[in-house]
Amino acid sequence: MAIAPNTRVLVAGYGLPAEFCVTTLIGMGVEIDKIAVATHREDNRNCGLHSMLRLRNIQFTTAAANSEEFYEFGANFDPDMIISMHYRSLIPGRFLKLAKKGSVNLHPSLLPAYRGTNSVAWVIINGESETGFSYHRMDENFDTGAILLQERISVEETDTAFSLFHRQIARAMLRLEEVILKLDQGDPGFAQLGEASYYARELPFGGVIDPRWSEVQIDRFIRAMFFPPFPPAVLKIDGKVYYVPSIDIYRSLMRGIPS
């Protein structure tokens, strides 16, 4: 389905989700000159987006979110809506106010639970049986705006942060067009209900296994830390550092380490 003619959309995003969002907008009939992108510098996870923007001649900026250059980019573009797809900084309130129809963000949890960052890892560490994703309207705080759409996803006993993250992304992308239409049509969403929780950007427990944990806890932690190309969970014993990508390797290491 198409959105209102001449709608101007600013995508604030990073990596594959932002790339998919731009593709979705083009597929919905949004003209190239009515799409702008705020992103981060090109790296291994953001190179696809940068290539697309250059190929399609889509205007973009990599200015820091708290900079005047960032604000001026948005003000000059004059967006009707802002879509945040894994943008890695808090977008200032005055920037959000530029969007006449408002803004929406994709968050990888069932808000208000697991606000903040590393939500996928913490879901596994805490032994949750389900998680999901939330598309929510944006305000000046992290992950507190009204919900436009949520979907639940089961957490499997063998899930790693890597597998769960990609399953969330795949499912969330299937619902993106629906969310864009909600924003375009002025859907106010509904208030976040339930107990809120928040997790900071720091790596859970510094990425280090505590051998005093139960094996169930250790298995969850190892799976939560598995997200290549980043290092897996670490085991430190007698001044030595061991990288532990699976519970089987942990067991093998423990059998070979003198007690």
UniProtKB/Swiss-Prot annotation:
Superkingdom field: Bacteria
Binding-site residues for (6S)-5,6,7,8-tetrahydrofolate, renumbered to this chain: 89-91, 139-143
One GO MF term: GDP-mannose 4,6-dehydratase activity
Reactions listed under catalytic activity: GDP-alpha-D-perosamine + (6R)-10-formyltetrahydrofolate = GDP-N-formyl-alpha-D-perosamine + (6S)-5,6,7,8-tetrahydrofolate + H(+)
Alphabetical keyword list: Lipopolysaccharide biosynthesis, Transferase
InterPro entries (UniProt xref): Formyl_transf_N (IPR002376), Formyl_transf_N_sf (IPR036477)
Annotated pathway: Bacterial outer membrane biogenesis; lipopolysaccharide biosynthesis
SUPFAM superfamilies: Formyltransferase (SSF53328)
Oligomer and partners: Homodimer.
Family affiliation: Belongs to the Fmt family.
Protein name: GDP-perosamine N-formyltransferase
The species this protein was found in: Brucella melitensis biotype 1 (strain ATCC 23456 / CCUG 17765 / NCTC 10094 / 16M)
Gene from which this protein is expressed: wbkC
